Amino acid sequence: MPTGRATHGTTLIVFGLLLNTPPLAAADCEMTQEYLTCMDKSNGNTAEMTDCISAETARQDARLNENYKRLMSKLSAKRKNSLQVAQRAWVKFRDANCSFYSDPEGGTAALLDGRDCFLQATANRAKELKNLTR
């Protein structure tokens, strides 16, 4: 029978493997080819990766706004209000959650994590809103 420690260790290993699957995450969130190419060309250079993430965040934010407007155009007044409330709450959560990742004591890696969190959350929400228009 495994001890709590062994189970915890196994959980950490599985979690670590899940974190190291950016191509799957990128495909799931519908990242652009420009982003994937940019990240590949960055060769792990933090400044270049930051530029790639910033550019893709702008593209994903535009996609999110487009999907939000499209969904709003299909909703009744009551449902529009519900979506506005939900979207405002989501923005607050995303900002607070991703700010937590940007630990000022964590160096450039933590800042990159915070920016990537923001990008992933925005892309996921854009996809979610797109799926709701169907």
Please state what every model-predicted region is.
Residues 24-134:
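N-terminal alpha-helical modules
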Residues 1-4:
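N-terminal secretory signal peptides that target proteins for export/translocation
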Residues 9-21:
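Bacterial N-terminal signal peptides
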